A protein has these predicted regions:
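Active-site-proximal helices and loops of the catalytic beta/alpha 8
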Residues: 65, 73-176, 181
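Substrate-binding/active-site clefts of carbohydrate-active enzymes
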Residues: 1-64, 82-93, 97
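Short capping/connector residues at structural and topological boundaries
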Residues: 29, 47, 156-157, 171, ...
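Hydrophobic positions within alpha-helical membrane elements
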Residues: 9, 77, 106, 192-194
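Loop/helix patches that line or flank the sugar-binding groove of alpha-linked glycan CAZymes
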Residues: 178-197
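Active-site-proximal beta-strand/loop segments in catalytic clefts of secreted hydrolases
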Residues: 5-6, 74, 101-103, 186-188
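Short, solvent-exposed loop/turn and secondary-structure capping segments
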Residues: 12-18, 109-111, 194-197
Length: 197
């Protein structure tokens, strides 16, 4: 089984702020926790926050013998922490699969640039894969044009772009291995594949 892990949707910022104020989240320069639509942005570059991520992944593999993880909003996390979690879990399961939503959503701490675990990271890793929104948008449409006609619903699309996506060469990011790219059309987000009227 592949588990869906959602480290970035904590609903309330207080969940971690009550443990240790101004630590577990990425912060603005004034000490305000950075948030997104799902709550606080978990500060995975902070030592104990990274440990929370890595240790919980290891625990799930060791205790429940899971085969892998799908990271919701993986692009919110730094690449080094996700890579460390993968390597730690792989010692327990050498066939571990790790993939995620590699959208370019990383906020980090203000004025502290760090490599995000997003689609742009795919040229640097062969251990973790990301979803290709390019193939989804061309075949059925998606954010930000959800519901607009696409290839399978009669919309005009460039067939060469679709073919490039089928061989793991999306047009919106570069990958150096086909295993870096998860081609998909529909998942738990957004509209269904197709609704008949």
């Amino acid at each position: 089984a592949i588990l869906d892990v959602v480290y970035n949707h904590t609903a309330k910022v207080d969940i971690f702020e009550d443990l240790e104020p101004n630590y577990y989240h990425f912060m603005d320069a004034d000490g305000t926790p950075r948030t997104s639509f799902g709550g606080g942005r978990l500060g995975t570059t902070h030592h104990m926050t990274k440990r929370l991520l890595v240790d919980s992944i290891k625990y799930l593999v060791d205790t429940y013998k899971v085969d892998g993880f799908r990271f919701d909003m993986m692009g919110d996390h730094d690449a080094a922490s996700v890579e460390e979690a993968y390597k730690a879990a792989r010692t327990l399961n050498p066939n571990l699969i790790m993939l995620g939503e590699g959208w370019r959503t990383y906020a980090g701490d203000e004025n502290m640039p760090t490599k995000a675990a997003d689609q742009d990271w795919m040229k640097k890793t062969d251990t973790v894969a990301v979803f290709s929104d390019d193939i989804r948008n061309n075949l059925k449409s998606g954010y930000p044009n959800e519901g607009q006609p696409a290839f399978i619903t009669g919309g005009k699309r460039d067939i060469n772009t679709i073919f490039k996506n089928l061989i793991a060469q999306p047009t919106n990011f570069e990958a150096d291995s086909p295993g870096d790219v998860i081609q998909y059309i529909a998942a738990h987000d957004n509209l269904t594949l197709f609704d008949r009227s």
